[in-house]
UniProtKB/Swiss-Prot annotation:
GO terms for biological process: anaerobic cobalamin biosynthetic process; methylation. Keywords: Cobalamin biosynthesis, Methyltransferase, S-adenosyl-L-methionine, Transferase. One of its GO terms (molecular function) is cobalt-precorrin-5B C1-methyltransferase activity. Residues 1-21 are annotated as: Disordered. The keyword Mitochondrion does not apply. Pathway: Cofactor biosynthesis; adenosylcobalamin biosynthesis; cob(II)yrinate a,c-diamide from sirohydrochlorin (anaerobic route): step 6/10. Coiled coil: none annotated. It comes from Chromobacterium violaceum (strain ATCC 12472 / DSM 30191 / JCM 1249 / CCUG 213 / NBRC 12614 / NCIMB 9131 / NCTC 9757 / MK). Belongs to the CbiD family. This is Cobalt-precorrin-5B C(1)-methyltransferase. It catalyses: Co-precorrin-5B + S-adenosyl-L-methionine = Co-precorrin-6A + S-adenosyl-L-homocysteine. Its EC number is 2.1.1.195.
Length: 377
């Protein structure tokens, strides 16, 4: 553990007053660390410290149990805690079964309850367990911390979830081609409560703060993708960038209401993010949560058809697993900037109908790794 890291205070409420939680990635990382501590050092821990992706912080995570399964394997369990976020995995038992291997490599495996990726278009390739990149990085860091400079003998990390196959049925995983269980997720290690009415109300507060000093422009981002563009290219201050989660319609309504109160016209409202969320607006969807709206395959395929792309490509887009898969499909074409620019134009026009006090709504789309797709490319 890096001594300069500070403890992350999970008990401190989020800006909207709601409780934060631990991601499945943090839980799995804690289980890995606890299991490896017993396997290598004989330490039976009831709490472990894990390094968060933010280099300034570590997180203390209680360990529910840790025990030898056999003479070669240790299993540790951690309970998922989602805070006030309505997470299907809240209270689930996330576990890691850890043993040494002779390969000299760290291997990620799916234990019962964690799904396997079967289709392209996700951040993990087919044939791999549904453990996302950041949780994998966190687990690698935990392994390095326990090894503490000792040679790496090769370690198998089998990550699972009790009743994960049942929990997964209440998620988007079956439609995404993730079979057999849940995904191990998280980009920060911390669950920021985003889906309750209290979060929607907090968006109005953030919008008011963003517009409070009468700036000529602000930005909405469904997630973290696009924040760098807002700061580095658009020159927006942090407080002028509002993370709106899935609540596009509510956020636009709040912006219009505040602008009416201020009696002014906003020059530009930027909407920055991944087309997986934003393209749903082509279907007139204002709440982009996966539980309330489907994926926008027909709509993005329709744009391709309107632009005269070959019918075979249009059919391939329709059958894509995710919109990120569409990004990959379109990367095989010689010039797709115009395609994404048309999606930007159409979604911006749709949003503009809700904010007549905004002179220009401008959309900029980015792939999952932050690569600009349309106008910004």
């Amino acid at each position: 553990m890096n001594p300069v890291r500070q403890p992350y205070d999970l008990a401190a409420p989020a800006p909207n007053g709601m409780r934060r939680g631990r991601t499945t990635g943090s839980c799995a990382t804690a289980a890995v660390k606890a299991a490896l501590m017993l396997l290598l050092d004989g330490v039976d821990a009831d709490e472990v410290f894990i390094s968060l992706p933010d280099p300034d912080f570590y997180l203390a995570v209680p360990v529910e149990s840790v025990a030898w399964l056999d003479e070669n394997t240790v299993r540790a369990e951690v309970l998922k805690y989602a805070g006030d976020d309505p997470d299907n995995t809240d209270g689930a038992t996330i576990f890691a079964e850890v043993k040494l291997n002779s390969s000299g490599a760290l291997r990620f495996l799916a234990a019962p309850g964690v799904g396997m990726v079967t289709q392209p278009g996700l951040r993990i390739p087919p044939g791999e367990p549904a453990i996302n990149p950041v949780p994998r990085q966190m687990m690698r860091m935990a392994v390095d911390e326990v090894l503490a400079g000792r040679p790496d003998p090769g370690i198998d990390l089998a990550i699972g979830c009790v009743d994960g196959d049942k929990i997964a049925k209440r998620t988007f995983n079956p439609m995404l081609g993730i079979v057999g269980g849940i995904s191990i997720l998280g980009t920060s290690g911390i669950v920021e409560p985003m889906s309750q009415a209290a979060w929607i109300a907090s968006i109005e507060v953030y919008v008011r703060v963003a517009l409070g000093e009468l700036p000529p422009a602000i930005a909405f981002t469904p997630g973290k993708i696009g924040r760098g563009y807002a700061a580095d290219t658009l020159g927006l201050e942090k407080k002028q960038v509002v993370q709106i989660a899935n609540f596009v319609g509510d956020s636009l309504d709040f912006a219009e209401s505040v602008l009416i109160e201020q009696g002014r016209i906003l020059d530009t409202l930027w909407v920055l993010g991944h087309p997986g969320k934003i393209a749903k607006l082509l279907d007139g969807v204002w709440d982009t949560h996966s539980g309330k709206s489907g994926m926008a395959m027909d709509a993005v395929a329709g744009v391709a058809a309107d632009l005269g792309y070959p019918s075979e490509l249009v059919a391939q887009i329709k059958q894509a697993n995710t919109v990120e898969n569409v990004v990959q499909i379109m990367n095989s074409q010689p010039d797709t900037r115009g395609y994404w620019m048309e999606i930007e134009r159409r979604t911006a026009a749709r949003m503009a109908t809700k904010v007549p006090s905004v002179r220009q709504v401008a959309v900029r789309l980015f792939s999952m790794d932050g690569t600009p797709l349309g106008e910004a490319a």
